[in-house]
Regions:
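Positively charged, low-complexity nucleic-acid-binding target-recognition regions
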Residues: 2, 290-291, 295-399
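Stable alpha-helical structural segments in soluble proteins, enriched in small hydrophobic residues
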Residues: 33, 81-92, 358-367
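Acidic carboxylate diad motif detector
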Residues: 53-163
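Generic recognition of long tandem-repeat/solenoid scaffolds
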Residues: 123-130, 167-171, 345-347
Length: 399
């Protein structure tokens, strides 16, 4: 299985200059070739091809203005850059993404290396290309040992410079899958929210830490200072890095918390049922959009899915239009008058007092069990045994 090992690089000042030149060349070639393909599209209504971009790059190298591309860039890295651009165009024409955009040196920068570009890894030192040798790096001891012993299994690698000025090297390597979590007979339904990030059908609630909200005032202060500084000045650059570091801190805190929650859910349950939320549609509500961005539902869903697949667990999605909050999990009565502001409601049929979110999680669980009980081909039990019928499932599964 191909997995990425992300290591932190600590290059010297000379190595930083070399890396920055390489990233700058990739960005320049990408932007110039993008401009060239845009002109072709305007004139002929054709997007061009990879060979068109590479031919134009060869012409650029011969110009005196761009003669530095011969010395500061690397041919295989430029090839990968142009291949990425070609993929971006194909995704646009197949309506998978927006039109390719020009790259800025103020954003996160990256360039991709093929597997033969990494010459050797010895201890905590890595040699990438001739101009980038003996770079110090840090990662876990387990990852460092695996990289030293299995360099031949490397598929590709990506050099990354963050907005805060940190350098990383993400190495894609063939690695055996390690199952971290125990197999259980438990199934749980989860409801995603804003006040509480996750509410389970067992009544457990995971708090929304609101990492962005806690740093919002500090970010506003830095942004005000940033707008008052002169563009290109030292103070302008210093404050820009401070803003980038604070945003990076918020992102890392949120990511750590999501991993912590996902690990607990997967360690305790074999099957997890959740709603297939339309996050882009929810973002249209301007009153909730900032809070939805802060909880990062998409990140949570992505991490839960890939960790479940690595650990022989199953994630089941129910229809986004299923009325999980409005339906009484005891008698099935549907309360159409329920508003978003109603956190508790009393069922007029059976008289049960419902916590809105816990009730939704229990309904999600029951709907997930119904879907699994259909034995449709897209829902197979993870593990050695086939998924039992809904009757057997209720006997074997704790909820």
């Amino acid at each position: 299985m191909l997995k990425a090992i992300k290591i932190r690089l600590y290059p010297t000042k000379t190595q930083q200059i070399t890396i920055n030149k390489l990233l700058g060349c990739c960005r320049l070639v990408y932007n110039l070739c993008l401009e060239h393909r845009n002109k072709i599209y305007e004139e002929t209504k054709e997007s061009g091809s990879l060979s068109t971009s590479y031919k134009y790059f060869c012409e650029l190298k011969e110009m005196e203005k761009y003669s530095f591309l011969k010395t500061d860039s690397h041919s295989k890295v430029i090839q990968q850059t142009l291949m990425n651009q070609d993929v971006a165009f194909k995704n646009f024409f197949t309506k998978k993404s927006d039109f390719p955009k020009f790259k800025s040196k103020k954003d996160k920068q990256s360039c991709r290396f093929p597997k033969d570009a990494i010459s050797s890894i010895k201890g905590n030192r890595i040699n990438i290309i001739k101009s980038l040798k003996d770079i110090h790096f840090k990662c876990s001891r387990k990852d460092e040992s695996y990289l030293n012993k299995n360099q031949r299994l490397i598929s590709s690698a990506t050099l990354i410079k963050t907005c805060s000025g940190k350098y990383y090297f993400s190495i894609l390597i063939d690695r055996p899958n390690e199952v971290r979590f125990n197999k259980t007979n438990n199934i749980v339904g989860i409801d995603l929210g804003i006040k509480d990030l996750i509410i389970t059908s067992n009544g457990e609630k995971f708090e929304n830490k609101q990492f962005y909200r806690k740093q919002e005032n500090k970010l506003k202060t830095l942004n005000r200072k940033f707008t008052k500084t002169q563009n290109g000045s030292n103070n302008h650059q210093k404050i820009r890095v401070k803003i980038a570091k604070l945003n990076e801190k918020i992102k890392n805190q949120r990511l750590w918390y999501i991993h912590h929650i996902v690990n607990q859910l997967l360690n305790e349950n074999q099957v997890i049922v959740m709603e297939d939320l339309n996050v882009s549609g929810m973002m249209q509500n301007h009153k909730l959009s900032k809070s939805i961005q802060d909880v990062s539902f998409c990140e949570l869903k992505q991490i839960l899915q890939y960790k479940a697949s690595w650990n022989d667990k199953q994630v089941v999605f129910i229809d986004r239009f299923y009325p999980s909050s409005k339906t009484c999990h005891c008698c099935g009565y549907k309360n159409d008058s329920l508003q978003l502001s109603d956190r508790e409601w009393v069922c007029p049929e059976c008289g049960v007092i419902h916590d809105r979110d816990i009730n939704a999680a229990k309904n999600i669980l029951e709907e997930g069990k119904r879907i699994i009980g259909l034995s449709s081909p897209e829902f197979k039990r993870v593990g050695e045994q086939a998924m039992a019928s809904s009757m057997n499932l209720e006997q074997n599964v704790k909820y």
